[in-house]
Curated annotation (Swiss-Prot):
Stated name of the protein: GMP reductase
Binding site for NADP(+): 108-131, 216-239
Organism expressing this protein natively: Edwardsiella ictaluri (strain 93-146)
One Pfam family in the UniProt entry: IMPDH
Subunit (UniProt): Homotetramer.
Record-listed E.C. numbers: 1.7.1.7
GO biological processes: purine nucleotide metabolic process
Amino acid sequence: MRIEEDLKLGFKDVLIRPKRSTLKSRSDVELAREYRFKHSGWQWSGVPLIAANMDTVGTFSMARVLAGFDVLTAVHKHYSVEQWQSFVSSVGEETLRHVMVSTGTSEADFIKLRQILALSPSLKFICIDVANGYSEHFVDFLRRARDVCPDKVICAGNVVTGEMVEELILSGADIVKVGIGPGSVCTTRVKTGVGYPQLSAVIECADAAHGLGGQIVSDGGCTMPGDVAKAFGGGADFVMLGGMLAAHAECEGRIVEEQGRKMMLFYGMSSASAMNRHVGGVADYRAAEGKTVSLPLRGPVENTVRDILGGLRSACTYVGASRLKELTKRTTFIRVAEQENRVFGRAD
């Protein structure tokens, strides 16, 4: 046993210090990024936000809308091959290039992944997703996927430390997914005592990934557009959003009525709700590590996306970054004791 004394920070612990700017308008800010990925060699450009691969966020309906904003969707792994086939035949190449195909790490998952990828050469992204990216089995699956799919962009996670980021990149990942426990409906930290404050994880993991020519995605912990800006400021190449995109018309979630008001259920993918739906319940040997909440219906997701993109542009103007690419270099974080004035409640 040992204790690390260094202070680790989450998004709520900091603000971004404003700096002199020559920008005249938020409209002058370019949010698109361009990446050439280490292993696949594929070059991609777009707005580096990703809808999370949760079954009430990473949906086909979400992918159709977000592609119009040049934003990615990690489509959840619970669609059948037949459902994928129907989706692929109903959308164009431009939508498919904004889609990540999510997979677990079982043999059945591997077979299904190959069947889905065979549907269209425009499906370029793979998202290998497990709660604990530190397992040897996970790394072996990643190596196998890289061998079979040399031209695909592989995003793999989740991890929170630099040495494991390096391990995954050297094993075939182009992008490493960073975050253990920060999600709005994740209870891993309270059930297990395991985790890492998200901003510090992003800063440390980005440093490790960039040293090897890889990228990271900050997954979890964003509750408002300012948190997204902080993630990019901390060095994230992509930011994945779950709760911020939940309960919209495109989420395909279950709608319930509470006190005469229509609500949508939103739950973590390790919650009892998710396991009851997809694997027949919580196994005897494990605990659920997610919770279920009911959220007011929020209408079309496009309004929320515009709000997030607007917040990002505004953050860039406050520090003089004409492009999102410049935000990290222009960011100085200051530690704070409070984030906002809540005399009239929390901001939306």
